[in-house]
Structures are given as C-alpha cells and as structure tokens.
C-alpha cells in the first residue's frame, strides 16, 4: 500500500476556523492521493503515533480499495455549535438549516452552556433535536448535576456525549441520569476498538472514521460494540468529511443525525464551492469517493513551511503503523 502512493508529494493545508472548537482554531492536514482518488490525513494534535497510524490508514483507504457501496444516497446531519455566545449560536443554527444541533458544553461555566442551549432551542423550535458533547470535561457528580440542568434548558436532550473520561465514570453517570449517554473518546483511545463491548457503559456509540482506521474498520466496530452507532468528525475539510458520510451511508439508520456539518466551521475549503459539504435542508450527500482538491484553493490554504515540516514528520511516524 505504501508503494502505491507518493507521500512526499502530499500537500499540507491550514484552514482557519470561523469559531474555535475547544482549543482548535485551524483545520490542518495533508491530502493523500491514491490510484483511485484523494484522502485526508488530519489527526488531532493529541493523537499519539499509533493513533495517527489509524488516521493514515483511513486516508489511503478510499484511494486504494475504495469505500463500500452505500445503503442511502444522503444522510441527516447535525450542525455543530462550539463554545460561542448565545447570539452566535442562534445565527449558526439559522444558517445551517439543520433539524439537529450538537452543542459543545463543559469547557466553560455551566451558566454559559445553559444560555447557549436556550438560544439553540429558540432557533431550532420545539420539535428539533439537541444533543450535547462534554468532551470528557466533567467528573461524575458534576456530570450528573450539569446534565439535569442542560436537559431542562434544552427542553429535552437527545443524548449527552462523553460526559467523563473513563468508561467506568460514564457508566456511573448513566445510572444516575435519565438522558441517554453516548461515548466516542473511549473508542478512539482503545488499543483495539473492534473488541470493545459497550452495552454496559452507554446507550450510543459515536464513530469517527479517521480515529478508527477507515470506513471498513468502523463498520466492524459498529458490528461488535453492541449498541446503536452514529457518525461524527473532527475538524476536517470536505475531503475528510466525505469519509464520515460514506460510513453513515452504510450503517443501519438508527434515527440520529450524524455530526458531520463541520464544513460550516471552516473559513474556506480545499475543494471548489460547489463540492464543499455544506448542509442543505439538514442533509448531506453520500458519494462513492471524496471530491478532488482544487489546486488554487490548496495553494491558497497552504500551510507555513514550519507546519509543513511538522506534518511531514507526523506522516513519517504514522507510516510505521500501517
């Protein structure tokens, strides 16, 4: 697989976000061209080399063996609302035209989270769905208190994702609250996510294609984890987001929108405007392969020489785990 791809030719891009997502202010990564098409290598900075190896496996999957045929031509998508002001949250919901919002919580004061949720509910209306992602910020007692308050502020939550860091803490929270609980980071951190049974810990699993090593490996996780699965993404361009859509398109429909609306958080993209994965009426299309990068846009959003060197080292380390 390594010999089919010229990794040295992979361009490095850096697209500023319109709004920070936690500590992330820039969408950075490499575009990997395989014999059949392009993939994206954009592991978060927190990933170790082994985890980055999974992201690289995912990046070269579509350009070498391709993705499985989808069951659906489009999937419902949730708009991501980071830690922003209530007015900004309301605007983001209105612009996205989605029927589900995934609201980041736990990073700041609970009062700010509550105000943001109330604004999101006001913008969405009473019949739309709201979920929260706490990114493991809470301990058990804080999670229990916060979830009850957030559920009231939202007028009902669809679920809360990753309230605490460990599965044991999450299981304890789940027993003490009435809101369904989802896990994602626990899957990413596992040495072998395909062998992780989750039914005793959570109600839902959130799968990220890059973190799990590609669409096919993610499908195997969905088959073995024992609970319903939906799909999410990190800060990725439309090329990377296409992998999440490919997975969502082959999984059984469990009635939850996938958190794949991240292109709206980008100040630009590496694909042409018509190919950028911006939600329309709450849905995104499932395609057999990602859109090809636009050379002009790749040049416009090219990373600095220092970041290019960093990503080259990152890629070399990840290749050891292919």
Question: Could you say what each language-model-derived stretch is?
Answer:
Residues 59, 192-297:
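Shared catalytic-loop signature of beta/alpha-barrel
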Residues 107-123, 138-142, 163-175, 190-192, ...:
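Active-site-adjacent beta->alpha loops and helix N-cap segments on the catalytic face
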Residues 101-109, 129-136, 154-167, 179-189, ...:
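Catalytic beta/alpha-barrel core
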Residues 17-19, 188, 236:
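Residue-level detector of flexible, active-site-proximal loop/helix-junction positions
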């Amino acid at each position: 697989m390594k010999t089919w791809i010229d990794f040295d030719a992979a361009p490095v891009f850096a697209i500023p976000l319109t709004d920070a997502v936690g500590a992330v202010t820039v969408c950075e990564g490499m575009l990997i061209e395989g014999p059949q098409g392009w993939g994206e290598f954009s592991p978060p900075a927190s990933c170790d080399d082994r985890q980055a190896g999974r992201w690289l496996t995912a990046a070269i999957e579509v350009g070498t063996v391709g993705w499985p045929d989808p069951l659906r031509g489009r999937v419902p998508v949730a708009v991501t609302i980071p830690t922003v002001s209530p007015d900004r949250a309301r605007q983001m919901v209105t612009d996205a035209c989605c029927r589900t919002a995934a609201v980041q919580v736990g990073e700041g004061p609970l009062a700010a989270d509550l105000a943001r949720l109330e604004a999101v509910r006001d913008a969405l209306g009473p019949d739309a769905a709201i979920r929260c992602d706490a990114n493991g910020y809470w301990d058990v007692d804080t999670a229990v208190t916060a979830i009850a308050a957030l559920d009231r502020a939202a007028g009902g939550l669809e679920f809360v994702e990753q309230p605490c860091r460990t599965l044991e803490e999450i299981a304890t929270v789940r027993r003490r609250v009435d809101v369904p609980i989802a896990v994602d980071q626990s899957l990413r951190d596992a040495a072998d996510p395909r062998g992780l049974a989750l039914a005793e810990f959570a109600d839902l699993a959130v799968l990220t294609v890059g973190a799990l090593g590609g669409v096919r490996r993610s499908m195997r996780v969905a088959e073995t984890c024992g609970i319903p699965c939906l799909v999410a993404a990190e800060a990725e361009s439309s090329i990377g987001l296409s992998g999440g859509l490919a997975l969502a398109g082959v999984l059984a429909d469990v009635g939850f929108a996938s958190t794949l609306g991240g292109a709206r958080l980008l100040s630009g993209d590496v694909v042409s405007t018509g190919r950028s994965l911006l939600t329309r009426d709450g849905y995104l299309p499932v395609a057999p392969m990602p859109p090809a990068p636009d050379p002009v846009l790749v040049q416009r959003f090219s990373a600095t020489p220092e970041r290019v060197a960093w990503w080259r080292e990152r890629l070399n380390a990840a290749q050891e785990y292919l």
